[in-house]
Amino acid sequence: MTTTLSNALLSDILQQIRPLIGQGKVADYIPALAQVPANQLAMAVYTVDGELYQAGMADKRFSIQSISKVLSLTLALTRYDESEIWQRVGKEPSGLPFNSLIQLEMEKGLPRNPFINAGAIVITDMLQSRLSAPKQRMLEVIRALTNTADICYNTVVAKSEMEHLSRNAAIAYLMKSFDNFDNDVITVLETYFHYCSIEMSCVELVRCFSYLANQGICVGSKNQIITPRQARQINALMLTCGMYDGAGEFAFRIGIPGKSGVGGGIIAVVPDAFTVAVWSPELDKSGNSLAGCAALELLANKVGRSIF
C-alpha cells in the first residue's frame, strides 16, 4: 500500500533514520566541512504541481559540493552544442573513487562522466571559455531557479578547498597534457571550488532542480531551462553516475536518479512527479550521506515510486 506525501510522512522518516547518526563520518579532508555538527537532519519534497513538503532543518543551508556538478552540466548544455560536450567528457560510470587519476591516465585524459571531479572540472573549463563571469552567472541561474536572491558562495569553504587543491590540480594538469583543457588551471579550479561551496537548503534544492522532474521546465517560473530530452539525459547520468562509486547500490535500493555531495546533501528526482532533497552530514564509505540514503529508501518504498 502506498502512502501520500505529507509533512508528517517526512517527519516520520527522519524519526526512523535518526538512530543512524553516529554511524557515518563527516567529510574531514575539507577543514571547513569537518566542523559541521553531525546530528542535523533535513528533508524536502517539491512536486511538479508546486506542492512543497518539508521536515527537520529543511531551511538550513549547507555546502552542496558535488550536487553543483549537475548545475554546471545544465549550464554547459545551454551554451554548447551537445556534441562538443560529449567529445570532452564521457557518459559511463567510473567504478573508481571520484578523484581517481588512474582511469584518467589510462583513458588519455577523457573523464568517464561529468559527475566525477575530472568531468566536472572539464565542464567548468568549458564554462570558463564561454562565459565572461562564470561564478556570477551560476549564482544568477540558481537564484532564478529558486526565486531566492541571497543564495551565495561560502568563501571560507572555497578558500579551504583552494588551500588543498593538489589532487584536483593534478587531475586538471593531466587532462591538459592530453589537450583536454583550455584555460589556466588555477583560474578554472577557483571557479570549480566556488561552485562546490554554494550553500542551499533542502527547500531551495528541490525548487532549484524541479526542471529535472518537469520535462526541463522550472516548476516555479515555468521557464524552459533545457529540453525534455536533455532532462532525461541528465537524469540517466544521475542514475548511473550520480552517487560516486555507490551508484549501483543506490539504484538497486532506491531506484531513482540522485546526485550527492560530500556536504551530506542528496538531490533525487522522480520524473513527472517530484524532486526530493535530504541532508545529513555523516557519509558512508562511498562519500554519500548515510542517513540521507536511508531516508530516500524509506520514501521510495512508502510512496511506491521508482523509475523501474
Curated annotation (Swiss-Prot):
It catalyses: L-glutamine + H2O = L-glutamate + NH4(+). Its EC number is 3.5.1.2. The keyword Hydrolase applies. PANTHER family: GLUTAMINASE. One of its GO terms (molecular function) is glutaminase activity. Belongs to the glutaminase family. InterPro entries: Beta-lactam/transpept-like, Glutaminase. Signal peptide: none annotated. The lineage of its organism: Bacteria, Pseudomonadati, Pseudomonadota, Gammaproteobacteria, Enterobacterales. Substrate binds at S66, N117, E161, N168, Y192, Y244, V262. It comes from the Bacteria. One of its GO terms (biological process) is glutamine catabolic process. Keywords: Hydrolase. The gene is glsA. This is Glutaminase. Homotetramer.
